[in-house]
Amino acid sequence: MNKYYNMKKVILLFIVAIISNTIAISQNSEEAEKLLNKVSENIKSYSNIYINYTYTLFNSEEDINQTNKGSFVTEDDKWKFVMLDVTRIFDGDKLYTISPDDEEVTISTQNPDDESTITPNKMLYFYEEGYNFEMDIVQYVGRKKIQYVKLIPMDSDAEIKYILLGVDIEFSQIYKVIETGVNDTQTTIAIVDFEVNLPLEESLFVFDKEKYKDYYMNILD
């Protein structure tokens, strides 16, 4: 009698533990999603955004450790993006890629479905689709409280293991993005400056052909 009673008790406790764990995971996921939704809403409330950042690529096995600086500014559907000395300007119609090393300007129509194309929108809203969320660690950087959210790709064939997205809790802004690939390459984007609602000149998103009259114009479409 005691034997069967104890067995039932163990099974019951096991079921309760599973249910409790499932509820905790669900609450954790909801809390993470709520935080990311707040970040998205906050970003979309700004008339424009200017960001300076560092971009670090690290893989100890491949002996890779590279850090570069970049910046971008975006307003409505227009943006300007600078990285590795290459400037990209999207005026709402055409995309201009300016490469000083090649002395070339490539003019094309932006394809929003092209996954290889880096745009400010992809950097600011990449987490909105294709991931499961869960709350991760909290770090303090000076007086800043940074809450990390772990993003796990829904696609089992994704080249990404997971992403840690650091959020500045006080301002509901992205602070850092740490991506770990299936090959253990770690890509880190750290926000250095995050400015919003600036008085921008209209010419900022205009390609001035006169400045590049000695460059080769590669018109794709």
Stretches with model-predicted labels:
Residues 10-20:
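Sec-dependent N-terminal signal peptides
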Residues 1-10:
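Positively charged n-region of N-terminal signal peptides that target proteins for export
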Residues 110-145:
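Flexible, surface-exposed loop/linker segments and immediately adjacent secondary-structure boundaries
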Residues 22-63, 77, 211-221:
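N-terminal leader/targeting segments and the immediate start of mature chains
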Residues 131-138, 142-220:
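Gly/Pro-enriched, hydrophobic low-complexity segments
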Residues 69-118, 187-188:
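An acidic-aromatic
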Residues 55-57, 83, 99-100, 178-181:
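Beta-turn initiation residues at beta-strand->coil junctions
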